[in-house]
Amino acid sequence: IVMNFDAEKVKNDIVEWIKDWFNENGKGCKGVLGISGGKDSSVVAALLVEALGKENVVGVLMPNGEQFDIDVSKDLVEFLGIKSVTINIKDAFNGFMNEFKSNNVELSTQAITKDTIAAAISISIITSLNWSKNL
């Protein structure tokens, strides 16, 4: 059991750390992050908005084809008032899967294999957008 946990202090410390990091490493840059609508990306997005201002945060929505819960991500972006970009990763994902198949590569049937491929695509997208000239 954690005693005397001060959530407000922890949040403020994180916000200050984000400000310091951007001042030292990316002054004038925007925070670009993937928005899934889940707890993790929602909390990080809110912390970035508090630290950098909503005009300096860009949310990236990356559905893999049709995503039944994409509205949760859109609602978060709207609530925070941040700019967003939606990049559908379906074609890239299917391209990888087709290349594996055409080369007779049998992937594990575990969902984690497909999740790993989708995550790698997402990281590439966010990294590329991080260098964008017009976001």
Language-model-derived ranges and their functions:
Residues 1-135:
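ATP-dependent adenylation/nucleotidyltransferase module used to activate substrates
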